[in-house]
Amino acid sequence: MPITWTISPAERLVTVKADGPVTLKNAEEYLDALVVNDAMPYRKLVDCTAMQPIASDGEMMQLGGRMRAYVATLEGGPLAFVVTRPDVLDYVKRYINLVMGATRPVKIFQTVDEARRWLDAQKV
């Protein structure tokens, strides 16, 4: 599976690993799991170091619509992305721009350790 995740209610933390080609459908499955498990307010560490983003402009707009609906109705927790490649950085920045208006902190890091330290300092 291109996106794998672990939801830890005890830590109020979701750890995500995107590996290989990631499609809109993959992203939607992950988001659905967050909603079903009431994990939207949890801290999220998203490791994109091995990700190959595959999304058309239309698919990004679809994802944006979904994200704006979530922002309007659900509280989102702090979000830390781990990115090491320029093509993935562009994709992640587009994703972040889709959820402008969300009040949660979002930051991009180059290592999982940096991201985890930052997330550990965030209140949820």
How would you describe each model-predicted region?
Residues 1-124:
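Amphipathic, Lys/Arg-enriched alpha-helical "gate/interface" segment within cytosolic domains
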